[in-house]
């Protein structure tokens, strides 16, 4: 299932294109443009990465 970056919520399990695996979103910053993943890595969601996959 694909969703827009603006629909990402804390606690969602999302796919990181950079790391190639799923992580839990722990924090959302800058009006949804930057998210913190459960491994502590920041993921920028910009025009090149406008959608993320969530695990069902």
Place the predicted regions along the sequence by residue.
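Mixed-charge, Lys/Arg-rich low-complexity intrinsically disordered regions
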Residues: 1-9
């Amino acid at each position: 299932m694909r969703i827009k970056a603006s629909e990402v919520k804390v606690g969602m399990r999302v796919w990181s294109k950079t790391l190639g695996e799923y992580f839990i979103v722990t924090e959302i910053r800058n009006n949804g443009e930057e998210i913190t993943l459960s491994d502590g890595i920041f993921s920028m969601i910009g025009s090149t990465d406008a959608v993320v996959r969530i695990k069902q």
